[in-house]
Amino acid sequence: MCGRNQLFVASLLASACLIYCVQYVTVFYGVPVWRNASIPLFCATKNRDTWGTIQCLPDNDDYQEIALNVTEAFDAWNNTVTEQAVEDVWSLFETSIKPCVKLTPLCVAMRCNSTTAKNTTSTPTTTTTANTTIGENSSCIRTDNCTGLGEEEMVDCQFNMTGLERDKKKLYNETWYSKDVVCESKDTKKEKTCYMNHCNTSVITESCDKHYWDTMRFRYCAPPGFALLRCNDTNYSGFEPNCSKVVAATCTRMMETQTSTWFGFNGTRAENRTYIYWHGRDNRTIISLNKFYNLTILCKRPGNKTVVPITLMSGLVFHSQPINRRPRQAWCWFKGEWKEAMKEVKLTLAKHPRYKGTNDTEKIRFIAPGERSDPEVAYMWTNCRGEFLYCNMTWFLNWVENRTNQTQHNYVPCHIKQIINTWHKVGKNVYLPPREGQLTCNSTVTSIIANIDGGENQTNITFSAEVAELYRLELGDYKLIEVTPIGFAPTSIKRYSSAPVRNKRGVFVLGFLGFLTTAGAAMGAASLTLSAQSRTSLAGIVQQQQQLLDVVKRQQEMLRLTVWGTKNLQARVTAIEKYLKDQAQLNSWGCAFRQVCHTTVPWVNDTLTPDWNNITWQEWEQRIRNLEANISESLEQAQIQQEKNMYELQKLNSWDVFSNWFDLTSWIKYIQYGVYIVVGIIVLRMVIYVVQMLSRLRKGYRPVFSSPPAYS
């Protein structure tokens, strides 16, 4: 008897466990979960010039940041934000400078005479050493005749071309910068055979008009439904798989458009310290300079410059200098405590965790790239008021490195070129010769672009021409994310089970970023506020879209529907599309407009359950990412079956309403069923009757025609 009781109790416990221990999939809407995204960002600026207005929306300064208690990976080089910045600044650059007419290169042989000036950009005088450091009160700054500076090196050329008149050649005279032509070295006489140095290019682009390239400040903003995360760790060096100080933002900080090699100008990341962003897999670096040293660069191009157009043939015009007029060289002066700043760079490099070279700063040197590199690499290349300067940095490097027996100056000679290698895409642009009058540019030097080649005996910091690296420093601590508010987790509650009544409460709308405030909280704590969070999400999305719509309305250029205009307008509808997509997915599971939705689908993996008090939703989502597809499919199948069951139930329950008894269509249908049943019964009785009659006949029946009796 006792054994039977124990068996009964065990069976009860087993039944209870089967009922209550089964875990079911529960859908949560409004969880703080995100994943990396790569959608287009839109830019905002306060610059009101024409081309900047076309490219970006007006800036309204209505942005916020919220600290998150999470750990996230950041990479300045594998980053959609920095890549978009490079692409967009290139677009701004081309829009401003406007090299817009494509021409066939001028590749005829020319007879040229060299008119060598006193000193040239490419080979500054180094036969006699000189140490000249100019200051604010130096007279040569005003007269542009500092030691070593001379006139531009030019070449006077003659060549024949046809085109203006049929089968008739015309002799042209043209003066070129010596850097824009290549002469045959075998010629020893004064008159040499020369070609333009772009003749190996199939198509080049010539500037339509002379334009300024003034830097502009702008910021990037994420479309509604997306956000930007920023690593706020002071030790962040461009690559950090576990950044623990993370903030969420709708927009980036303001940044400057920068286009230069060797140095970055007017950056926004300078602090009272020197720090280095280092590529995670090679020796590329971008070094942020300490703003304490007040490092600036002043570039000047003396006046007395004239330009004349030369018509080569119909539709082909080149602009040139008048013959035998040589302008004075452009030059750049480096102001500030440069030697101290460079020493601090070396000390910072020696302490960097990625650095494996010598710790002796005397063996760490700044060097220039090889002379055989492209001009933009071999020289410091920058843009001053629309003109492209190529500066030979030999004097400067000798000065900061204190190289004895070498010419040392804190200024360098520069050369202006018409034919430019594009810095972002492979190609060449031909720009108009420099405009007349004096040009002056003053910029703050905030960073160095360099490659680090370290060794036990010596380390070389080689200046680089990677313009894109400037934006790794400006925006490399950001990453773009897409908020995915739908989450799955196992619970013991099955659909249609009674749930505790929740008291209603007001929602404090923090905007869209308020949606992420519980990202660092445990799953259980975050789940308690899902109802408020989902409403916050929708309210924040609508608010964010309204702000974007306001700035679009304020920009009249958007009515032209340029490429950027359509891009920014598309950003406005991204969040609604995303929200509707989420709701459509929830609806396919029978969970539309619910914050917590219990289902009848059993949890697929009993060993994988969340610790509601010690794990965040972001961590949990990473664990079950491989199961989400199967869970989603199971939820859809369960919802389809649920709808079928509901349909059948509704058919059975259709007679419980008294009015349905008087529905003629229902009566006709069931009358048909009755007729079918009666006819079936009649047919069945007829079959039974025939069978019975045959059975009786077989028992007493003799055949009428039987075999005749046999007679003996």
Curated annotation (Swiss-Prot):
Region (MPER): 651-672
Entry keywords, A to Z: AIDS, Apoptosis, Clathrin-mediated endocytosis of virus by host, Cleavage on pair of basic residues, Coiled coil, Disulfide bond, Fusion of virus membrane with host endosomal membrane, Fusion of virus membrane with host membrane, Glycoprotein, Host cell membrane, Host endosome, Host membrane, Host-virus interaction, Inhibition of host innate immune response by virus, Inhibition of host tetherin by virus, Membrane, Signal, Transmembrane, Transmembrane helix, Viral attachment to host cell, Viral envelope protein, Viral immunoevasion, Viral penetration into host cytoplasm, Virion, Virus endocytosis by host, Virus entry into host cell
Post-translational modification: Specific enzymatic cleavages in vivo yield mature proteins. Envelope glycoproteins are synthesized as an inactive precursor that is heavily N-glycosylated and processed likely by host cell furin in the Golgi to yield the mature SU and TM proteins. The cleavage site between SU and TM requires the minimal sequence [KR]-X-[KR]-R.
Segments of this protein annotated with the region V3: 299-331
CDD domains: HIV-1-like_HR1-HR2
Annotated signal peptide: 1-24
Region (V1): 112-156
Domain note: Some of the most genetically diverse regions of the viral genome are present in Env. They are called variable regions 1 through 5 (V1 through V5). Coreceptor usage of gp120 is determined mainly by the primary structure of the third variable region (V3) in the outer domain of gp120. Binding to CCR5 involves a region adjacent in addition to V3.
Source species: Human immunodeficiency virus type 2 subtype A (isolate ST/24.1C#2)
Region V2: start-end pairs: 157-199
Superkingdom of origin organism: Viruses
Span of the annotated motif YXXV motif: 701-704
Stretches the record annotates as V4: 391-414
GO molecular function, one term: structural molecule activity
InterPro entries: Gp120_core_sf, GP41-like, HIV1_Gp120
Gene3D superfamilies, A to Z: 1.10.287.210, Human immunodeficiency virus 1, Gp160, envelope glycoprotein (2.170.40.20)
Protein name per its UniProtKB record: Envelope glycoprotein gp160
